[in-house]
Amino acid sequence: MDKSKRPFIKSKRSFRRRLPPIQSGDRIDYRNMSLISRFISEQGKILSRRVNRLTLKQQRLITSAIKQARILSLLPFLNNEKQFERTESTTRTANFRTKNK
């Protein structure tokens, strides 16, 4: 077929492969907080394998390391920053109301 007769074929874009999130020299360990913290969301949840772009074996090792760090209280189970902000704002409004009376 002639190229002019193929109207729906798109030109290929250049593909740049992303670097793997875990290098070959990185050790997946519960004490390696700089590595573990990359795979935890802002709320303290373990991110999924699809989001992390990890292999199955790496995801299992990361998950077990995070859980072990939580048990040894190196990591919090939840990040409740929003909850603390709410309690501070409610106490401020309560104090403001009592001062006006």
Curated annotation (Swiss-Prot):
User: Which Pfam families does this one have?
Assistant: Ribosomal_S18 (PF01084)
Q: Which InterPro entries match?
A: Ribosomal_bS18, Ribosomal_bS18_CS, Ribosomal_bS18_sf
- At which residues is there a site annotated Not N-formylated? 1
Q: Where is this protein found?
A: Plastid, Chloroplast
Sorted alphabetically, which keywords does the UniProt record give?
Chloroplast, Plastid, Ribonucleoprotein, Ribosomal protein, RNA-binding, rRNA-binding
Q: Which GO terms describe its molecular function?
A: small ribosomal subunit rRNA binding; structural constituent of ribosome
This protein's superkingdom? Answer: Eukaryota
GO BP annotation list? translation
GO cellular component terms attached to this protein's record: chloroplast; mitochondrial small ribosomal subunit
> Where is it mainly found?
plastid
The further comment given in this record reads: Two forms, which differ in pI, are produced, S18 alpha and S18 beta.
Q: How does it assemble?
A: Component of the chloroplast small ribosomal subunit (SSU). Mature 70S chloroplast ribosomes of higher plants consist of a small (30S) and a large (50S) subunit. The 30S small subunit contains 1 molecule of ribosomal RNA (16S rRNA) and 24 different proteins. The 50S large subunit contains 3 rRNA molecules (23S, 5S and 4.5S rRNA) and 33 different proteins.
The family annotation for this protein states: Belongs to the bacterial ribosomal protein bS18 family.
Give the protein's function.
Component of the chloroplast ribosome (chloro-ribosome), a dedicated translation machinery responsible for the synthesis of chloroplast genome-encoded proteins, including proteins of the transcription and translation machinery and components of the photosynthetic apparatus.
- What PANTHER family does the record tag this protein with? 30S RIBOSOMAL PROTEIN S18, SMALL RIBOSOMAL SUBUNIT PROTEIN BS18M
Q: What protein am I looking at?
A: Small ribosomal subunit protein bS18c
Q: Which organism is it from?
A: Spinacia oleracea
Q: What is the lineage of its organism?
A: Eukaryota, Viridiplantae, Streptophyta, Embryophyta, Tracheophyta
